[in-house]
């Protein structure tokens, strides 16, 4: 989907993001991908990987298109038990909004081990641009979280996703094992 958006084959696409399946393709294709707040967009009709972590999100070529698509798909849905009633996101898509006095938090804990120098430089450029618009930038660390605890994140992800996806797919896999490709089958078995 991300490649189709980037190539101009489609104006937009929806994806499901549990561990990066909207944000990763967006990053790799140079497009906009958004993982909305949990419960903002209904997941009714989506085959789950993990019902407690799945998000439906837009992929577009521009931020403006992303806002338009998000506005079209967000909202409470009583057919999704995890849907939450939230105020809609109201952003002036013409860019006529004032960021002065707004605050952005940037997570800095342990990033020195995972960011390349180029990424660090680009993040700093973006932060400098925000600062020039009057945005307050605050660093968010996890002082109480040790590095070893933070590295357990992927393990905890697997502890949640594995059983949830297996529970959903168990019956179908028993009856239609050949309908699953090698990678999904290995992941679920």
Where are these regions (language model features)?
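Short helix-loop capping/hinge segments that flank enzyme active sites or metal/cofactor-binding pockets
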Residues: 98-107, 159-189
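Acyltransferase
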Residues: 91, 117-143, 169-175
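Active-site-proximal alpha-helical scaffold in enzymes
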Residues: 1-27, 59-63, 67-70
């Amino acid at each position: 989907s991300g490649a189709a958006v980037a190539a101009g084959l489609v104006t937009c696409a929806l994806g499901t993001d549990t561990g990066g399946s909207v944000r990763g393709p967006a990053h790799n294709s140079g497009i906009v991908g958004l993982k909305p707040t949990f419960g903002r967009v209904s997941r009714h009709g989506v085959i789950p990987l993990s019902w407690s972590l799945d998000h439906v999100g837009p992929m577009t070529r521009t931020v403006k298109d992303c806002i338009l698509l998000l506005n079209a798909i967000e909202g409470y849905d009583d057919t999704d038990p995890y849907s939450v009633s939230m105020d809609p996101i109201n952003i002036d898509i013409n860019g006529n909004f004032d960021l002065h006095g707004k605050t952005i938090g940037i997570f800095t804990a342990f990033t020195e081990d995972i960011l390349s120098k180029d990424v660090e430089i680009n993040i700093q450029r973006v932060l400098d641009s925000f600062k020039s618009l009057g945005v307050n930038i605050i660093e968010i660390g996890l002082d109480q979280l040790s590095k070893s605890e933070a590295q357990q994140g992927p393990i905890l992800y697997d502890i949640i996703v594995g059983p949830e996806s297996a529970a959903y797919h168990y019956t179908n896999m028993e009856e239609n094992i050949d309908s699953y490709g090698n990678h999904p089958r290995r992941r679920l078995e």
